Curated annotation (Swiss-Prot):
The chain crosses the membrane at residues 1-21, 357-377. This is UPF0754 membrane protein Lm4b_02251. It comes from Listeria monocytogenes serotype 4b (strain CLIP80459). It comes from the Bacteria. The keyword Membrane applies. Its main location: membrane. It is found in: Cell membrane. Keywords: Cell membrane, Membrane, Transmembrane, Transmembrane helix. PANTHER family: UPF0754 MEMBRANE PROTEIN YHEB (PTHR35791:SF1).
Amino acid sequence: MSVLFTILLMAVIGGFIGAMTNYIAIRMLFRPYKAIYLFNKRLPFTPGLIPKRRDELAEHIGKVVVSHLLTEDAIRARLLDENLQKEITDTITKMFHEKMQLETTPNELLHHFGYENAEIRSMTWVEKTLEKEINHFLTTKKTTKMSDLIPTMLESELTTKLPHVTERITSKMTLFVSSEEGKIQIKQMLQKFFEEHGKMGSMARMFINIDSFSEKIQQEGLKLIGQEDTKNLINQLLTTEWKNFEAKELQELIPTEKQAHLAGQLTSELIQTFPHEKLFNQPIQVMLRGYEAAITEKVIPFAVERMLDFVATHSAEIVERMDLAKLVETQIATFSLPEIEKLVVEISGRELKMITYLGGILGGFIGIIQGVLAMWI
Protein backbone atom coordinates (compact mmCIF):
# COMPACT_ATOMS: atom_id res chain seq x y z
CA MET A 1 0.00 0.00 0.00
CA SER A 2 2.85 2.35 0.89
CA VAL A 3 4.51 1.56 -2.45
CA LEU A 4 1.37 2.45 -4.44
CA PHE A 5 0.86 5.60 -2.35
CA THR A 6 4.47 6.64 -2.98
CA ILE A 7 4.11 6.13 -6.73
CA LEU A 8 0.80 8.07 -6.83
CA LEU A 9 2.27 10.85 -4.71
CA MET A 10 5.28 11.10 -7.03
CA ALA A 11 2.90 11.15 -10.02
CA VAL A 12 0.79 13.93 -8.50
CA ILE A 13 3.86 15.95 -7.57
CA GLY A 14 5.40 15.42 -11.02
CA GLY A 15 2.15 16.29 -12.77
CA PHE A 16 1.74 19.44 -10.70
CA ILE A 17 5.32 20.51 -11.35
CA GLY A 18 5.01 19.78 -15.09
CA ALA A 19 1.71 21.63 -15.45
CA MET A 20 2.90 24.62 -13.41
CA THR A 21 6.18 24.74 -15.34
CA ASN A 22 4.37 24.99 -18.69
CA TYR A 23 1.80 27.40 -17.26
CA ILE A 24 4.54 29.69 -15.93
CA ALA A 25 6.46 29.39 -19.21
CA ILE A 26 3.38 30.43 -21.18
CA ARG A 27 2.71 33.33 -18.82
CA MET A 28 6.34 34.40 -19.14
CA LEU A 29 5.75 34.95 -22.85
CA PHE A 30 3.72 38.04 -21.85
CA ARG A 31 4.56 38.82 -18.23
CA PRO A 32 5.91 40.90 -16.76
CA TYR A 33 5.21 43.78 -19.13
CA LYS A 34 8.19 45.76 -17.80
CA ALA A 35 11.65 44.93 -16.50
CA ILE A 36 11.90 44.33 -12.74
CA TYR A 37 14.98 45.57 -10.90
CA LEU A 38 16.34 44.39 -7.57
CA PHE A 39 19.26 46.31 -6.08
CA ASN A 40 19.65 48.07 -9.45
CA LYS A 41 20.01 44.71 -11.14
CA ARG A 42 17.48 43.60 -13.73
CA LEU A 43 15.98 40.27 -12.84
CA PRO A 44 16.38 37.54 -15.47
CA PHE A 45 13.46 36.93 -17.87
CA THR A 46 12.04 40.42 -17.24
CA PRO A 47 10.27 41.75 -19.14
CA GLY A 48 8.51 38.81 -20.81
CA LEU A 49 9.53 37.54 -24.25
CA ILE A 50 6.84 39.32 -26.27
CA PRO A 51 7.15 42.68 -24.42
CA LYS A 52 10.93 42.49 -24.81
CA ARG A 53 10.83 41.60 -28.50
CA ARG A 54 7.72 43.60 -29.30
CA ASP A 55 9.33 45.91 -31.90
CA GLU A 56 11.17 43.05 -33.59
CA LEU A 57 7.98 40.99 -33.58
CA ALA A 58 5.98 43.80 -35.19
CA GLU A 59 8.67 44.33 -37.83
CA HIS A 60 8.91 40.64 -38.71
CA ILE A 61 5.13 40.19 -38.83
CA GLY A 62 4.95 43.14 -41.25
CA LYS A 63 7.60 41.59 -43.48
CA VAL A 64 5.93 38.17 -43.36
CA VAL A 65 2.54 39.66 -44.27
CA VAL A 66 3.97 41.47 -47.32
CA SER A 67 6.31 38.66 -48.39
CA HIS A 68 3.94 35.73 -48.03
CA LEU A 69 0.37 36.98 -47.58
CA LEU A 70 -0.35 40.34 -49.20
CA THR A 71 1.95 39.86 -52.17
CA GLU A 72 1.58 41.84 -55.40
CA ASP A 73 0.45 38.72 -57.26
CA ALA A 74 -2.11 37.87 -54.58
CA ILE A 75 -3.51 41.41 -54.60
CA ARG A 76 -3.62 41.49 -58.42
CA ALA A 77 -5.34 38.10 -58.58
CA ARG A 78 -7.92 39.20 -56.03
CA LEU A 79 -8.60 42.47 -57.84
CA LEU A 80 -9.13 40.65 -61.14
CA ASP A 81 -11.40 38.04 -59.55
CA GLU A 82 -14.78 38.08 -61.28
CA ASN A 83 -16.56 37.34 -58.02
CA LEU A 84 -15.07 40.44 -56.39
CA GLN A 85 -16.03 42.52 -59.41
CA LYS A 86 -19.59 41.20 -59.22
CA GLU A 87 -19.80 41.86 -55.47
CA ILE A 88 -18.61 45.45 -55.84
CA THR A 89 -20.89 46.03 -58.83
CA ASP A 90 -23.91 44.64 -56.97
CA THR A 91 -23.11 46.74 -53.89
CA ILE A 92 -22.75 49.97 -55.86
CA THR A 93 -25.88 49.18 -57.90
CA LYS A 94 -27.85 48.60 -54.71
CA MET A 95 -26.61 51.87 -53.25
CA PHE A 96 -27.46 53.67 -56.49
CA HIS A 97 -31.04 52.31 -56.47
CA GLU A 98 -31.42 53.39 -52.84
CA LYS A 99 -30.25 56.90 -53.66
CA MET A 100 -32.59 57.04 -56.66
CA GLN A 101 -35.55 56.68 -54.28
CA LEU A 102 -34.62 59.99 -52.65
CA GLU A 103 -34.97 63.54 -53.93
CA THR A 104 -31.70 65.37 -53.49
CA THR A 105 -30.96 68.63 -55.30
CA PRO A 106 -27.40 69.69 -56.16
CA ASN A 107 -27.82 72.53 -53.66
CA GLU A 108 -28.67 70.07 -50.89
CA LEU A 109 -25.85 67.73 -51.85
CA LEU A 110 -23.28 70.54 -51.84
CA HIS A 111 -24.69 71.84 -48.55
CA HIS A 112 -24.20 68.36 -47.11
CA PHE A 113 -20.50 68.61 -47.98
CA GLY A 114 -20.23 72.03 -46.36
CA TYR A 115 -20.52 74.12 -49.53
CA GLU A 116 -22.96 76.91 -48.59
CA ASN A 117 -24.78 79.13 -51.14
CA ALA A 118 -23.59 76.80 -53.88
CA GLU A 119 -25.71 78.28 -56.67
CA ILE A 120 -24.70 81.90 -56.05
CA ARG A 121 -21.05 81.10 -55.49
CA SER A 122 -20.87 78.77 -58.49
CA MET A 123 -22.54 81.19 -60.88
CA THR A 124 -20.40 84.07 -59.60
CA TRP A 125 -17.31 82.00 -60.28
CA VAL A 126 -18.60 80.97 -63.72
CA GLU A 127 -19.43 84.57 -64.61
CA LYS A 128 -16.01 85.89 -63.56
CA THR A 129 -14.17 83.05 -65.26
CA LEU A 130 -16.21 83.34 -68.45
CA GLU A 131 -15.74 87.12 -68.69
CA LYS A 132 -12.02 86.72 -68.02
CA GLU A 133 -11.67 84.09 -70.74
CA ILE A 134 -13.62 86.16 -73.28
CA ASN A 135 -11.46 89.21 -72.53
CA HIS A 136 -8.34 87.05 -72.84
CA PHE A 137 -9.54 85.69 -76.18
CA LEU A 138 -10.36 89.14 -77.57
CA THR A 139 -6.99 90.50 -76.43
CA THR A 140 -4.78 87.67 -77.67
CA LYS A 141 -6.64 87.26 -80.97
CA LYS A 142 -7.15 90.93 -81.84
CA THR A 143 -4.64 90.86 -84.74
CA THR A 144 -5.89 87.53 -86.04
CA LYS A 145 -7.88 87.50 -89.25
CA MET A 146 -11.44 86.26 -89.12
CA SER A 147 -10.60 83.54 -91.64
CA ASP A 148 -8.22 82.06 -89.06
CA LEU A 149 -10.77 82.30 -86.25
CA ILE A 150 -13.64 80.67 -88.11
CA PRO A 151 -13.37 76.85 -88.10
CA THR A 152 -12.62 75.38 -91.52
CA MET A 153 -15.73 73.19 -91.42
CA LEU A 154 -17.96 76.18 -90.58
CA GLU A 155 -16.30 78.33 -93.26
CA SER A 156 -16.84 75.64 -95.88
CA GLU A 157 -20.45 75.19 -94.77
CA LEU A 158 -21.15 78.94 -94.96
CA THR A 159 -19.54 79.21 -98.40
CA THR A 160 -21.70 76.41 -99.78
CA LYS A 161 -24.78 78.05 -98.26
CA LEU A 162 -24.30 81.39 -100.08
CA PRO A 163 -26.29 80.30 -103.20
CA HIS A 164 -29.13 79.24 -100.90
CA VAL A 165 -28.96 82.63 -99.20
CA THR A 166 -29.19 84.27 -102.64
CA GLU A 167 -32.26 82.20 -103.47
CA ARG A 168 -33.85 83.16 -100.18
CA ILE A 169 -33.13 86.86 -100.73
CA THR A 170 -34.62 86.86 -104.23
CA SER A 171 -37.58 84.84 -102.97
CA LYS A 172 -38.25 87.36 -100.21
CA MET A 173 -37.81 90.26 -102.66
CA THR A 174 -40.27 88.67 -105.11
CA LEU A 175 -42.75 88.04 -102.33
CA PHE A 176 -42.53 91.63 -101.12
CA VAL A 177 -42.62 93.35 -104.53
CA SER A 178 -45.60 91.26 -105.68
CA SER A 179 -47.55 91.94 -102.50
CA GLU A 180 -50.03 94.73 -101.97
CA GLU A 181 -47.69 96.26 -99.45
CA GLY A 182 -44.93 96.30 -102.08
CA LYS A 183 -47.21 97.95 -104.56
CA ILE A 184 -48.12 100.66 -102.04
CA GLN A 185 -44.44 101.18 -101.21
CA ILE A 186 -43.60 101.64 -104.92
CA LYS A 187 -46.44 104.13 -105.33
CA GLN A 188 -45.30 106.12 -102.30
CA MET A 189 -41.74 106.20 -103.62
CA LEU A 190 -42.97 107.54 -107.00
CA GLN A 191 -45.07 110.21 -105.32
CA LYS A 192 -42.11 111.25 -103.19
CA PHE A 193 -39.89 111.35 -106.27
CA PHE A 194 -42.25 113.69 -108.14
CA GLU A 195 -42.71 115.89 -105.08
CA GLU A 196 -38.96 116.29 -104.65
CA HIS A 197 -38.59 117.57 -108.24
CA GLY A 198 -40.92 120.53 -107.84
CA LYS A 199 -42.58 121.87 -110.98
CA MET A 200 -40.97 119.29 -113.23
CA GLY A 201 -42.38 116.60 -111.05
CA SER A 202 -45.81 118.19 -110.99
CA MET A 203 -45.77 118.52 -114.76
CA ALA A 204 -44.74 114.87 -115.16
CA ARG A 205 -47.58 113.78 -112.92
CA MET A 206 -50.03 115.44 -115.34
CA PHE A 207 -49.00 113.01 -118.07
CA ILE A 208 -48.42 109.92 -115.94
CA ASN A 209 -50.98 107.76 -114.16
CA ILE A 210 -49.33 106.90 -110.84
CA ASP A 211 -51.30 103.69 -110.36
CA SER A 212 -50.57 102.22 -113.77
CA PHE A 213 -46.96 103.39 -113.62
CA SER A 214 -46.58 101.72 -110.21
CA GLU A 215 -47.95 98.47 -111.61
CA LYS A 216 -45.55 98.71 -114.54
CA ILE A 217 -42.58 99.24 -112.25
CA GLN A 218 -43.81 96.36 -110.09
CA GLN A 219 -43.93 94.03 -113.09
CA GLU A 220 -40.53 95.10 -114.36
CA GLY A 221 -39.08 94.75 -110.88
CA LEU A 222 -40.36 91.18 -110.66
CA LYS A 223 -38.82 90.40 -114.04
CA LEU A 224 -35.51 91.92 -112.95
CA ILE A 225 -35.47 89.96 -109.69
CA GLY A 226 -36.23 86.71 -111.50
CA GLN A 227 -33.38 87.08 -113.98
CA GLU A 228 -30.35 84.81 -113.55
CA ASP A 229 -28.01 87.80 -113.88
CA THR A 230 -29.63 89.40 -110.84
CA LYS A 231 -29.14 86.24 -108.81
CA ASN A 232 -25.51 86.01 -109.93
CA LEU A 233 -24.97 89.65 -108.99
CA ILE A 234 -26.44 89.14 -105.51
CA ASN A 235 -24.40 85.97 -105.04
CA GLN A 236 -21.25 87.80 -106.17
CA LEU A 237 -21.95 90.66 -103.75
CA LEU A 238 -22.47 88.23 -100.88
CA THR A 239 -19.26 86.36 -101.75
CA THR A 240 -17.29 89.61 -101.93
CA GLU A 241 -18.64 90.81 -98.60
CA TRP A 242 -17.88 87.44 -97.03
CA LYS A 243 -14.29 87.54 -98.32
CA ASN A 244 -13.91 91.10 -97.03
CA PHE A 245 -15.22 89.98 -93.66
CA GLU A 246 -12.76 87.08 -93.52
CA ALA A 247 -9.86 89.36 -94.41
CA LYS A 248 -10.54 91.72 -91.51
CA GLU A 249 -8.73 91.43 -88.20
CA LEU A 250 -10.76 90.92 -85.04
CA GLN A 251 -9.79 94.37 -83.72
CA GLU A 252 -11.34 96.00 -86.82
CA LEU A 253 -14.71 94.53 -85.89
CA ILE A 254 -14.26 94.87 -82.13
CA PRO A 255 -12.07 97.87 -81.17
CA THR A 256 -9.95 97.52 -78.04
CA GLU A 257 -11.96 100.13 -76.12
CA LYS A 258 -15.13 98.10 -76.64
CA GLN A 259 -13.72 94.68 -75.72
CA ALA A 260 -14.49 94.86 -72.00
CA HIS A 261 -18.05 96.05 -72.65
CA LEU A 262 -18.64 93.30 -75.22
CA ALA A 263 -17.17 90.65 -72.90
CA GLY A 264 -19.52 91.80 -70.14
CA GLN A 265 -22.53 91.71 -72.47
CA LEU A 266 -21.69 88.26 -73.83
CA THR A 267 -21.14 86.93 -70.32
CA SER A 268 -24.44 88.39 -69.12
CA GLU A 269 -26.33 86.90 -72.07
CA LEU A 270 -24.76 83.48 -71.60
CA ILE A 271 -25.46 83.47 -67.86
CA GLN A 272 -29.09 84.43 -68.45
CA THR A 273 -29.43 81.71 -71.08
CA PHE A 274 -27.92 79.05 -68.80
CA PRO A 275 -30.70 77.32 -66.76
CA HIS A 276 -28.77 77.43 -63.48
CA GLU A 277 -31.85 77.70 -61.26
CA LYS A 278 -33.27 74.48 -62.67
CA LEU A 279 -29.87 72.81 -62.56
CA PHE A 280 -29.25 73.55 -58.87
CA ASN A 281 -32.80 73.07 -57.57
CA GLN A 282 -34.06 70.10 -59.57
CA PRO A 283 -33.53 66.72 -57.84
CA ILE A 284 -30.55 64.86 -59.22
CA GLN A 285 -32.71 61.73 -59.35
CA VAL A 286 -35.10 63.45 -61.79
CA MET A 287 -32.21 64.35 -64.09
CA LEU A 288 -30.89 60.78 -63.97
CA ARG A 289 -34.25 59.02 -64.20
CA GLY A 290 -34.07 58.51 -67.95
CA TYR A 291 -30.57 57.07 -67.72
CA GLU A 292 -31.12 54.80 -64.70
CA ALA A 293 -31.13 51.56 -66.70
CA ALA A 294 -28.05 52.55 -68.70
CA ILE A 295 -26.19 53.52 -65.53
CA THR A 296 -26.93 50.24 -63.72
CA GLU A 297 -26.43 47.99 -66.74
CA LYS A 298 -23.47 49.66 -68.43
CA VAL A 299 -21.88 52.57 -66.57
CA ILE A 300 -21.45 50.97 -63.12
CA PRO A 301 -20.11 47.58 -64.38
CA PHE A 302 -17.77 49.36 -66.80
CA ALA A 303 -16.54 51.80 -64.13
CA VAL A 304 -15.93 49.00 -61.61
CA GLU A 305 -14.09 46.90 -64.19
CA ARG A 306 -11.91 49.84 -65.26
CA MET A 307 -11.22 50.82 -61.65
CA LEU A 308 -10.18 47.32 -60.58
CA ASP A 309 -8.14 46.86 -63.75
CA PHE A 310 -6.35 50.15 -63.11
CA VAL A 311 -5.60 49.25 -59.48
CA ALA A 312 -4.45 45.76 -60.50
CA THR A 313 -2.18 47.17 -63.21
CA HIS A 314 -0.59 49.58 -60.76
CA SER A 315 -0.74 47.25 -57.75
CA ALA A 316 3.05 47.02 -57.47
CA GLU A 317 3.41 50.78 -57.29
CA ILE A 318 0.45 51.09 -54.91
CA VAL A 319 1.81 48.42 -52.55
CA GLU A 320 5.21 50.07 -52.64
CA ARG A 321 3.79 53.51 -51.89
CA MET A 322 1.52 52.17 -49.14
CA ASP A 323 4.50 50.37 -47.53
CA LEU A 324 2.27 47.62 -46.14
CA ALA A 325 5.08 46.15 -44.04
CA LYS A 326 5.49 49.45 -42.23
CA LEU A 327 1.72 49.82 -41.96
CA VAL A 328 1.34 46.41 -40.29
CA GLU A 329 4.33 47.12 -38.04
CA THR A 330 2.86 50.47 -36.99
CA GLN A 331 -0.57 48.99 -36.29
CA ILE A 332 0.88 46.17 -34.17
CA ALA A 333 3.03 48.69 -32.30
CA THR A 334 -0.13 50.62 -31.38
CA PHE A 335 -1.54 47.59 -29.56
CA SER A 336 -1.03 47.65 -25.80
CA LEU A 337 0.62 44.59 -24.28
CA PRO A 338 -2.62 43.46 -22.58
CA GLU A 339 -4.36 43.71 -25.97
CA ILE A 340 -1.68 41.58 -27.63
CA GLU A 341 -1.92 39.02 -24.82
CA LYS A 342 -5.70 38.94 -25.10
CA LEU A 343 -5.49 38.55 -28.88
CA VAL A 344 -3.05 35.62 -28.69
CA VAL A 345 -5.06 33.92 -25.93
CA GLU A 346 -8.32 34.32 -27.89
CA ILE A 347 -6.74 32.80 -30.97
CA SER A 348 -4.77 29.95 -29.36
CA GLY A 349 -6.20 29.69 -25.82
CA ARG A 350 -7.28 26.09 -26.32
CA GLU A 351 -3.83 25.06 -27.57
CA LEU A 352 -2.13 26.86 -24.67
CA LYS A 353 -4.34 24.96 -22.21
CA MET A 354 -3.48 21.69 -23.95
CA ILE A 355 0.23 22.53 -23.55
CA THR A 356 -0.36 23.07 -19.82
CA TYR A 357 -2.25 19.76 -19.57
CA LEU A 358 0.46 18.02 -21.57
CA GLY A 359 3.05 19.31 -19.09
CA GLY A 360 0.97 17.84 -16.26
CA ILE A 361 0.64 14.49 -18.03
CA LEU A 362 4.34 14.29 -18.82
CA GLY A 363 5.19 15.39 -15.26
CA GLY A 364 2.86 12.72 -13.84
CA PHE A 365 4.35 10.06 -16.11
CA ILE A 366 7.87 11.08 -15.06
CA GLY A 367 6.73 11.02 -11.40
CA ILE A 368 5.46 7.44 -11.83
CA ILE A 369 8.78 6.39 -13.34
CA GLN A 370 10.64 8.10 -10.51
CA GLY A 371 8.41 6.35 -7.93
CA VAL A 372 9.02 2.93 -9.51
CA LEU A 373 12.76 3.54 -9.71
CA ALA A 374 12.79 4.73 -6.09
CA MET A 375 11.33 1.37 -5.01
CA TRP A 376 14.10 -0.51 -6.76
CA ILE A 377 16.98 1.55 -5.43
